[in-house]
Amino acid sequence: MKKEALNKSYAILGAARSGIGIARFLKRKGADVFISDESSEEKLLYLDKDILDKENIGYEIGGHSDKIFDYDIIIKSPGIKPDSEIIKKAVSKNKEIYSEIEVASWFCDAPIIAITGTNGKTTTTVLTGEILSRQGLDVKVCGNVGLAFSEVLDDLKENSIVVLETSSFQLFNTKYFKPKAAAVLNVTVDHIDWHGNFENYFEAKTNININQTDEDYFIYNYDDPECKARFAGRTLNGNVCAFSYEPEIQTLFKAGAYVEKNKINYFDIIKYINAPVIDIRDIFIKGKHNVQNAMAAILLTKIFGVTDEVIADTLKDFKGVEHRIEFVREIDGVRYYNDSKATNYDSTYVALESFPSDIILIMGGKKGDNNFARVDEFIKSRVKKIFAIGQTRDAIYEHYNEFVKVVKCDSLEEAVNKSNKDS
C-alpha cells in the first residue's frame, strides 16, 4: 500500500493539526501535496507559512479553488461535512476522499488500537496508553487526543503500539483502515447535524470493524442499548469480546470483562481464565461510566499481555484527563470538579450519575439545544442548585426552576463565584 500511495498526489482540505501533519509527512516521503483551507490566516493556529515554504508545500487560504481537483486523492478535515459544496463537487468528479487516519494507517506497520464512542473515548484512550506504557511497551497515543496520527509515524519503532482515539467524522472517510484491536464504548445521539441521521452516525462508528480479520479483536459495550441491539444482529469481524456490568456475558462471549461483587473480572474461555482484576472501589476515577471505560482498557491491554498487577496499579493511580469529571481541589469540605467536556446530554447524565446528591451544577449550552429530558431524573433527585450560563440559560431556568433553584449568570466567572458562596 505504501508504494502505491506514494505514486499518488494529495490535496488536503483543512489546515488544522491533522491536515498539516499529514501534508508534511507525505511530502517527506516524496509525494506531491497541496493544502487548501477556506478560513482566514488568523484563524489557522497550525498554519506556519515559513515551514510550508521551506518544505515546498503549496497552499491556499480563504477559500477552495478548483486546483484541488488536479490531485488524485483528497484528504478531508473531520470538520468538513459530507454534504458541503466542495465535497459534493469532489464526489461528482469521482475523487477518492479519505480522512487523515485512513491515509496515515497506510504507512503504519505497528499494531493499532482504535477506540471510539460518543462518550469516554479520550479517557479510555489515555488510560489504555498509560497501562501499556507501565508494562514497559513503547506506546504512541494520538488521534483525536493530542498529536495527530500522522505526527507519530516517523517515531514508530519495531515494537511500538499506536493507541488511536477515533471520531465518527474520521471513521466516516475510511476504506482500508484495519486496527489490531478496536473498541466501541457507546453510541448515543450526537453529531446528527454532521451525519444527517443516527443511522449514518452509527454506521460511521462501525467502520472501525469493517476490515478486521480473525487475527484482530473487536470489543464493545454490552450494556449500551444501541451497541447491544445492533451488534447482536449483524456479523462482526475478528475475535468479538464484550464488557458489561452483567456476569451473564460469560455465557455469550469467548472473552470479556464483567462486574461481580464489586470486582471487575476478566475471562477468556480458550485460556481457561476467569479471575478478578480490581475492586471497582479502588479505581481512582469515579462513576459507572469509568468502570466501563476501565473494562474496555483491560480488554484492550490484555491482548498485548499486560499483567493484572500492572492494570490494577494503573487504575488505582490514573487521575483521568482534563475537563472530564476532573477533580480540581477540595476547599472547606467542598469538592470541585471540572466536566466542561460534557458537550451533550449523555455525557452530562453520566457525570451526574457519578455523584449521589447535593450537587451544585453550572450548566449551559448552545441555543436550540434544549432537549433536557435525558438528565431530568438526576437534576431533580441529586442537584440542589443550578447556575445557568450561555445561550440556553433562559431555557434552563424555565425548565428546571419549578423543581430546583436556578440562578441565571452572565458569565462562567460569575457562576463560579456565586456557586462558591453557596457551597
What are these regions (language model features)?
Residues 31-40, 218-222, 362-363, 382-391:
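Short internal beta-strands
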Residues 1-99, 398:
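N-terminal leader/targeting and accessory segments in enzymes
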Residues 49-50, 57, 373-423:
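C-terminal helical cap/extension that packs against the catalytic core
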Residues 37, 63, 98-102, 235-259, ...:
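Beta-strand->loop->alpha-helix junctions that form or flank phosphate-binding loops
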Residues 27-28, 66-69, 78-222, 226-239, ...:
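Phosphate-binding loop of NTP-binding sites
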Residues 16, 39-41, 145, 223-224, ...:
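Residues in the short beta-alpha loop(s) of Rossmann-like NAD(P)-binding domains
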Residues 2-9, 19-29, 277-384, 398:
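Nucleotide phosphate-binding/pyrophosphate-handling subdomain across enzymes
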Residues 9, 31-32, 138, 180-181, ...:
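Residues at the starts of beta-strands that form the adenosine-phosphate
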